[in-house]
Amino acid sequence: MSERKYFGTDGVRGRVGQFPITPEFAVKLGWAAGRVLAAKGTSRVLVGKDTRVSGYMLESALEAGLAAAGVGVDFLGPMPTPGIAYLTRTFRAAAGIVISASHNPYYDNGIKFFADNGHKLPDAVELEIERLLDEPMDCVISEELGRAKRINDAAGRYIEFCKSVFPNEMTLEGLHIVVDCAHGATYHIAPNVLRELGAEVTEIGTQPNGLNINKECGATHLTALQNKVLETKADLGIALDGDGDRIMMVTENGRPIDGDEILYMLAVTAQNQGQLQGGVVGTLMTNFALEKELDKRRIPFVRAKVGDRYVIEELVKRDWYLGGENSGHVINRQHHTTGDGIIAGLQVLAAMYQEQKSLEKLSCDFHKLPQVLINVRFESDKQPLESENVKSVVREVESALAGTGRVLLRKSGTEPLIRVMVEGENEAKVKAFAQQIANEVEAATN
């Protein structure tokens, strides 16, 4: 298959005002996507966004390009990424377009696509869009131009969908939950879902101003949530990222719970309830402790490439339901086609109800191996992973670990970073090994 030129592992992403996140490129991308969709005989797409100020500019540019290709647009306004995937299916739209850079700062943005079935676009379709991006843009005749309108009840529809996955016989009454929405796309949704299911809710990160998304809050910055949980003596905390597809949690004692621990709790509870179908899919970054703990319980476990799209592909291939990443993407195909932070949180709350345990007790049997991740920035034309010095130091560290840990080096699919991950039983040694490799990677970028 051809190499992608514009699309990364999660659509097109970058700094606003710098190629490819410019109004000119967004118009062309809308047109190219519209041409591909129009060729399939479909004429409407949904467009949603997170709360970045640049979202208004990009949605207007996309709409212009789509209209020129003869494709109409239904605007959803601020909407979590998984909400856009869900509504794309229920509205029988040709595609859903998400304007978001997920957990990145406000000055970044991105554009990604869902197919009509709520899954990420197949590689072949993305490549066809890329091919058209390199062709001159044209415009349909006036009678065939796409038209735009807004869907005013989109948030309410998604709230009801989220509530529908929480079993009717259960309630959140008696639970005090702090929810941090990262000043992002879930700000008007997650607190309402939890309240309508009976919880007492304290909300933070729910005052977006276009520039504060993910700023010292949300799933990538847990300190604010930890402090609020302890201050209010809440039962637990839930942190979502800017577009709502990632979740982290905090116990009543302020202890952070990541995606690996959430997968462990959900898998074990599903097994106890006789509801686990097949096994669990993680990624190359999944903590080795999860693999070992699931093996003890005879729950199959496989690793996919990093990226929720690859986890989903592996789940579909094996007809399993449960998978995710330590970063907080958690997928349950029984409920949704993509990772959904709100739904993953509701599943954990349901597990607490079923097991009659607090979040602290539900997660206390799982002990992660020390894992250190160092990001090394590099110029896009460099190839540090091909360096013989880097390969040599990796072999040296793997030999020293002697099968009690792992080393993983990989390029980020969304940023110009090399991710250096080392895992093992001794935290001090793991830190030293990771720094040793990172230093060599950095030297190879100069």
Swiss-Prot record:
GO CC annotation terms, alphabetical: cytosol
Entry cofactors: Mg(2+)
What EC identifiers does the entry list? 5.4.2.10
Primary role: Catalyzes the conversion of glucosamine-6-phosphate to glucosamine-1-phosphate.
Show the stretches that span the lipid bilayer: none
Question: Where does the source fall among the domains of life?
Answer: Bacteria
Please provide an example of a Pfam family that matches this protein in its UniProt record: PGM_PMM_III
Any one GO biological process: carbohydrate metabolic process
Disulfide-linked positions: none
Reactions the enzyme catalyzes:
alpha-D-glucosamine 1-phosphate = D-glucosamine 6-phosphate
Q: What does the record's cofactor remark say about binding?
A: Binds 1 Mg(2+) ion per subunit.
Binding residues annotated for Mg(2+), in chain numbering: S102, D241, D243, D245
**Which range is the signal sequence, renumbered to this chain?**
none
Q: Which family does it belong to?
A: Belongs to the phosphohexose mutase family.
**Protein name according to UniProt:** Phosphoglucosamine mutase
Provide the GO MF annotations for this entry.
magnesium ion binding; phosphoglucosamine mutase activity; phosphomannomutase activity
Q: Which UniProt keywords apply?
A: Isomerase, Magnesium, Metal-binding, Phosphoprotein
Q: Which organism is it from?
A: Idiomarina loihiensis (strain ATCC BAA-735 / DSM 15497 / L2-TR)
Post-translational modifications reported in the UniProt record: Activated by phosphorylation.
Q: Which NCBIfam families match?
A: glmM, PRK10887.1
Catalytic site residues? S102 (phosphoserine intermediate)
* Modification Phosphoserine, positions: S102
